[in-house]
């Protein structure tokens, strides 16, 4: 099992250290989802994938089978339907960053659980064989559920980009600081997240991103799609960040060439020297 494959629960810890992102967000619109099942189906058609919730034993997508639903070391609980609505709002917001049918080229499904435990540590998201899981616990605020889902789509989906691209892994890892101490366990990664972020000159965008190379890439992808302006400013002042940004953009464009226009329009390509 790869313990680095998780989104930490709670908005503050998945924002890659950008407190201003929270402050600048608009107030979510009043809940208008009357039928979560119908709304999930509509969203799924938009990106060419399945969005499901309910019994975690059903969390798989064809051609996979029920036996493929469980993930070693991961415990999922069913989500409350009211909480699911908040997550669907977040997923909808995340989908705005991608061309239609784009995410369906990367994953087959998104499943909304209640709590997600990885080796006993509570997480905001993780992934299975060809799908991702997002947490919608009832004991956090509606806005936390929305934001965890929004950023979780970017964060968890990016792991499939990472794991399927050996050249990307080699190039990205080669840019990490020599001798950097990464964290192998879920509990150690959570503990590192609570610490001060490394200097931006290291190329890491947050304390959590500095825990593993995969988490580092996840954090770049998360900010590319949720707060590109922040990455543009950093890339313009830190050459190492520009290099890692370029690798991130290239890896996504290789999956969907339409993203070249997206990244050109929002200024990321220019900031990355592409």
Where are these regions (language model features)?
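Short, Lys/Arg-rich N-terminal segment immediately upstream of the first membrane anchor
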Residues: 1-4
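Hydrophobic alpha-helical membrane-insertion segments, chiefly the h-region
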Residues: 15-24
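Auxiliary, metal-adjacent structural segments of Zn-dependent hydrolase domains
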Residues: 71-129
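N-terminal export leaders
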Residues: 8-9
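Active-site-flanking segments in enzyme catalytic domains
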Residues: 107-274
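Non-catalytic architectural context of zinc metalloproteases
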Residues: 23-83, 112, 187-198, 210, ...
